Amino acid sequence: MKNWAGNLRFGAKRYHTPHTISEIQKIVHDSDHVKVLGTRHSFNNIADCQVDLISLESVVPRISVDPTNREVTVGAGVTYGDISTFLRDSGWGLHNLASLPHITIAGAIATATHGSGSNNGNLATAVTEIKWIAPDGSIVAHSRECDGGDFEGTVIGLGG
């Protein structure tokens, strides 16, 4: 498997394409080292892993809007193209957009991908809660409200 440009080859022993969150939980639980691979829009090997790579391309995109709290909830595999269309059709929008519709929202958040304009915060600045799968397979939630300053370190990380 190669990156988007075809100039990097991924070296993972196993490549997983789960369809459900429970399948992802099992893979994470059973693996010694795992990374989630987005749309492979990486310019270097930081996204690579020597053991298990998980692709979210087969997980059904989940997007919901809570108009009362003015919040949008998305699954990790949702792309900018998915969310832009959904939000437009719902009368909503994002404060900043990356230029590539095929990259995932989770990937853009985790790498602090910039969008348009130097005065606009990246998408990670709008995240209020994040859920992730711990090594034991459990789902862990962190929020800006409950975790304060530590929250930013949870949201942005390059996947070392």
Descriptions of predicted regions:
Residues 1-5:
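N-terminal regions that are enriched for targeting/export leaders
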Residues 108-160:
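FAD-binding subdomain of flavoenzyme oxidoreductases
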Residues 6-102, 112-117:
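Glycine-rich N-terminal segment of FAD-binding domains in flavoprotein oxidoreductases
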